[in-house]
């Protein structure tokens, strides 16, 4: 390093989120402090990738030195560890933007999720990605000297901070391109001022990085004694992991490479490494994380793969190679068929891109299908984290709709649990003889679904019903209309017909009862007028006096509530009021000669049905009043 302090020094305050992150990180990640080295070496590797990419169009950026690498030197007497790279470097504005602020959307949302539980916080912070700030886990002060490739030597920058409220930035002179990070180690960080400790950490975390990582070691004579001289020794293999044969790569290497590309702290759930030659030559390495990113449902969430062309890094977060519902997938794709000067705009409408996207999508679906069949417990872990976004795939990926549908999991009346463990294939296997539809119910919650009066007839006949209570489910069922040749049927729709599961004597008895109750139905319809679409008898209830249902082509209750919650105008849902002629309360209502009291019975039964269906009612005071008036007659 050859730097001299020049001028233009200023002190600036950290963005408030940075201060909070530094505090939390130092206390939550202390037990895993060696990750600071992984993060800083990973950043140095990224800086080299970016220089290679920009030098494609401007070779002068190499400044006569295209041998890229990372070097680590420690000084026990000065208590410092220095990590140096000769990558792209940073300008003054870059330093302020990247080292003084957290340039991520949804940061406030992230911090709102933090608690006082250190293990949970460390997991969240790991998902957020700490990068450069991890230096403060082991250092009580950090100095960064950097010069962006292409800038003059006297336009270099020095950044210094003790990781508290502020930092200083000043212009310096630096002859060499790239970045030097000097860590002034805490007492607890001094273990890293040791050649063998550094060797161990580099081998563990950075073997897969595609550029040399070297440390300054002592020269020894033939007898093994130190001569007092120093030399640089490369520690890692410096071969891009995805270019190696799968048989040569250990599970631990795959796991560490995942942490490098994702900046996640946890091991991935599974991965798929493939090299394809033919119409398109490419290598893909795709990982499924164990935990969902904290901001996965955020509209601005960055997702996508790292893109390499002929082993040259092109861009991060290339979203064009994965459908949106697979935005949790991490990894990379290395293509031989895309141009080196490819841009996001070119990727958008490129046949090669579309072909690679289709291939990567199928790889992930195959991975998940294999997991679902061979490791149910692991797949359930995946579903808990990513089930909501997978449901988007039914609408988004028409080409793979049946495969995506086969991966969905739901609760059902077969399993007395809110856990979503039932696949559609297993439901179809259990269908009753003569059953040709997949029955489902949507509700606000598992409890509401499980206790819905609409289930009474199905339980009595031993017919399984899928229970859906995620907010996305009603929307999902607009697109998921059949599976394995079986149509889906909502059990809250008026067109429901279970007559095939009834014997002739039962049908005849129902017909007689329906005729007897014809006048009661007409009387109820006359009282309610156009408040309901229709009044009719039903025999699908056992312990419930009445329910409301919608026409097959009418908007369902859950969809209406979803749109209302989104602030959209929703047309009034006209319900069909179905009364159970075999229930004691309905018989009591039918026997009532006083029209005023009859009307109160109607109000109470309709109010109950609306409350069970919607969870609320427009005029609860009218409902309560009708109940009170009836109670005074008891």
From Swiss-Prot:
The organism's place on the tree of life at top rank: Bacteria
Region feature C, mapped onto this chain: 562-634
SMART domains per the UniProt record, alphabetical: HATPase_c
UniProt entry keywords in alphabetical sequence: ATP-binding, Chaperone, Cytoplasm, Nucleotide-binding, Stress response
Primary residence: cytoplasm
Cellular-component GO terms for this entry: cytoplasm
Pfam families hit by this protein: HATPase_c_3, HSP90
GO MF, one example: unfolded protein binding
UniProt region (A), positions on chain: 1-344
Cell compartment(s), UniProt: Cytoplasm
UniProt region (B), positions on chain: 345-561
Alphabetical list of NCBIfam families matching this protein: PRK05218.1 (NF003555)
Described purpose of this protein according to its UniProt entry: Molecular chaperone. Has ATPase activity.
Quaternary organization: Homodimer.
Family as reported in the entry's similarity comment: Belongs to the heat shock protein 90 family.
PANTHER family in UniProt: HEAT SHOCK PROTEIN 90 FAMILY MEMBER (PTHR11528)
Name used for this protein in its record: Chaperone protein HtpG
Underlying gene: htpG
């Amino acid at each position: 390093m050859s730097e001299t302090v020049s001028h233009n020094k200023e002190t600036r305050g950290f963005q408030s989120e940075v201060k909070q992150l530094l505090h939390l990180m130092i206390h939550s990640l202390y037990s895993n402090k060696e990750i600071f080295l992984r993060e800083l070496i990973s950043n140095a590797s990224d800086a080299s990738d970016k220089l290679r990419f920009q030098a494609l169009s401007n070779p002068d950026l190499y400044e006569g030195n295209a041998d890229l690498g990372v070097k680590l030197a420690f000084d026990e007497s000065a208590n410092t560890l220095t990590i140096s790279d000769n990558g792209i470097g940073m300008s003054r504005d870059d330093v302020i933007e990247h080292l003084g602020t957290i340039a991520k959307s949804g940061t406030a949302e992230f911090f709102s999720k933090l608690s006082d539980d250190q293990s949970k916080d460390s997991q969240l912070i790991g998902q957020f990605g700490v990068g450069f700030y991890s230096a403060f886990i082991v250092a009580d002060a950090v100095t960064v000297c950097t010069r962006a490739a292409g800038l003059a030597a006297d336009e270099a920058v020095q950044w210094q901070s003790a990781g508290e409220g502020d930092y200083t930035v000043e212009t310096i002179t630096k002859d060499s391109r790239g970045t030097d990070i000097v860590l002034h180690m805490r007492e607890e960080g001094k273990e890293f001022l040791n050649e063998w400790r550094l060797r161990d950490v580099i081998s563990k975390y950075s073997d897969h990085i595609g550029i040399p990582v070297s440390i300054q070691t002592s020269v020894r004579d033939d007898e093994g004694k130190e001569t007092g001289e120093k030399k640089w020794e490369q520690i890692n293999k410096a071969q891009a992991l995805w270019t190696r044969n799968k048989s040569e790569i250990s599970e631990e290497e795959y796991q560490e490479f995942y942490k490098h590309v994702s900046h996640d702290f946890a091991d991935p759930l599974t991965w798929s490494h493939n090299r394809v030659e033919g119409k398109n030559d490419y290598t893909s390495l795709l990982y499924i994380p164990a935990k969902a990113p904290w901001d996965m449902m955020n509209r601005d969430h960055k997702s996508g793969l790292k893109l390499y062309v002929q082993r040259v890094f092109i861009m991060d977060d290339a979203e064009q190679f994965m459908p949106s519902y697979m935005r949790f997938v991490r990894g990379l794709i290395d293509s031989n068929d895309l141009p080196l000067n490819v841009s996001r705009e070119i990727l958008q409408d490129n046949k090669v891109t579309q072909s690679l996207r289709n291939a990567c999508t199928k790889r992930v679906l195959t991975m998940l299908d294999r997991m679902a069949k061979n490791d149910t417990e692991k797949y359930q872990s995946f579903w808990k984290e990513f089930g909501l976004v997978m449901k988007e795939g039914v609408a988004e990926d028409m080409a793979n709709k049946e495969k995506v549908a086969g991966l969905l999991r739901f609760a059902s009346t077969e399993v007395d649990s809110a856990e979503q463990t039932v696949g559609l294939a297993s439901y179809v296997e259990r269908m009753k003889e003569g059953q040709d539809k997949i029955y489902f119910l949507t509700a606000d919650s598992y409890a509401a679904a499980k206790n819905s009066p609409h289930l009474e007839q199905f339980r009595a006949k031993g017919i399984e019903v899928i229970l859906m209570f995620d907010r996305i489910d009603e929307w999902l069922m607009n697109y998921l209309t059949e599976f394995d040749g079986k149509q889906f049927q909502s059990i809250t729709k008026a067109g429901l017909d279970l007559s095939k599961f009834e014997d002739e004597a039962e049908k005849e008895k129902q017909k007689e009862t329906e005729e007897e109750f014809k006048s009661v139905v007409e009387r109820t319809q006359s009282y309610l007028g156009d408040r309901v679409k229709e009044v009719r008898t039903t025999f699908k209830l056992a312990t419930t006096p009445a329910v409301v249902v919608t026409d097959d082509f009418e908007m369902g209750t859950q969809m209406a509530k979803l749109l209302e919650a989104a602030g959209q105008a929703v047309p009034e849902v006209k319900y069909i009021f179905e009364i159970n002629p075999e229930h004691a309360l309905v018989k009591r209502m039918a026997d009532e000669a006083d029209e005023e009291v009859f009307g109160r019975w109607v109000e109470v039964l309709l109010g109950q049905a609306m409350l069970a269906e919607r969870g609320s009612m427009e005029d609860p005071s009218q409902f309560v009043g009708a109940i009170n008036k009836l109670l005074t007659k008891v």
